Amino acid sequence: MNVLFFTSWYPTLLQPHFGVFVKEHAHAIHLAGHNIVVLALLVSKKKCLFQIKVEKNKDEAGVRTVVVQINSFLRDYLYHFLPFQYLILKHIYRKHIAADFKPDIIHSNVVFPAGTLGDWLAKSLNIPHVITEHWSRIKGALDMPFISGAIIKAYSKSAAIMPVSHFLKNSIQSLIPDLPEKKFSVVGNVVKTDLFHYKEKIVGTDEIRFCAIATWSHKKIPDKLPELFIEALANVQKKMNIKVKLIMIGGGDRLDELSVLSKLKDLNAEFRGFLGKEEICSILHSCDFLVHASTTETFGVGVAEALMTGTPVICSAVGALPELVNESNGVLCVNNIENWEEGIIGAINTKYNHRIIAEEVKARFSQHTIGQQITQVYDKLK
């Protein structure tokens, strides 16, 4: 099937990790045997009135990719002004794609703005439109009068909606209850098995090693709660009279604050900053557990990546995380210090089958599995 894969989130040379999970879906579709062209329309804030750049290439997986970069100090206005973006989209499609590629389907990623624009383009081409949904901010978008109607219409007119978790599916259905159940197919994110793989854990060391991976930044509405596991680990260390080491991976403006808290609690914490996936995998192999305290998750890629290495996870019982973590591969915690202490102690006292943990997650989220699940959705539209 010829698939025009449209997105407003996609990695670039300047932002190599922006929307990388969207790119992994594109690769999964390509590996499933579909003829896919990626069209990424990105709007960024820069100190210029208006600038547009078009880059065309085949990426490392052989996927034909057209990236349109719009730069302007009016970014926020242009990002929400859908008719303007649609004019650009149609122009780029006609000039750079239409001559030698006729799509059978448009596959958009995230309902706003890509899903709404994809809906309009699919209507003009008279072909089906499907949406993969990653977005946790749909409720806020539906409160915006200028775009809420377009979002509801895009969902309603789509041939299929593929949220990355049951949690996100339920959230969409609660916000727009008129959407029929048959429209939904849950398709998770890809976890790259060539990077994240099982390796036998080293046992009998004199310390228990924990790892945490996120961007540690201040936000108006906090989504990560590192102080929970820092304090809980410090308390468990004293209660059990054991050595604990915490490795914190990721950048952000909270690093100094968290370092001070760790020292204050007498917790041996090492802050590594931003690391590539290969280094993260190596650290996960050397750690006994991943800790992940958050207020919500639409999927939890970092958690799935840890499980893919066979590393048990201690995490918050929020969002989609209960779909990934259970008593066979970790512990789910209520977000308070006492329950986190109980969860950490319970995990330390549990003997996990690390190989089985890795195999089960690989079976659910490999490129092959996700590619086949998306193909099943496409096949229903023929």
What is the predicted role of each segment?
Residues 40, 156-198, 212-215:
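Donor nucleotide-sugar binding/catalytic pocket of nucleotide-sugar-dependent glycosyltransferases
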Residues 1-59:
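N-terminal subdomain of nucleotide-sugar transferases
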Residues 295:
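Aromatic "clamp/platform" in nucleotide-sugar-dependent glycosyltransferases that forms part
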Residues 274-275, 282-287:
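Short alpha-helical donor nucleotide-sugar binding micro-motif in glycosyltransferases
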Residues 327-338, 345-351:
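Conserved acidic donor-binding segment of nucleotide-sugar-dependent glycosyltransferases
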Residues 4, 202-224, 230-234, 247:
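Conserved donor-binding/catalytic core segment of Leloir-type glycosyltransferases
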Residues 259-278:
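Nucleotide-activated donor-binding/catalytic signature segment of Leloir-type glycosyltransferases, i.e.
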Residues 312-315:
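Short hydrophobic beta-strand element within catalytic cores of glycosyltransferases
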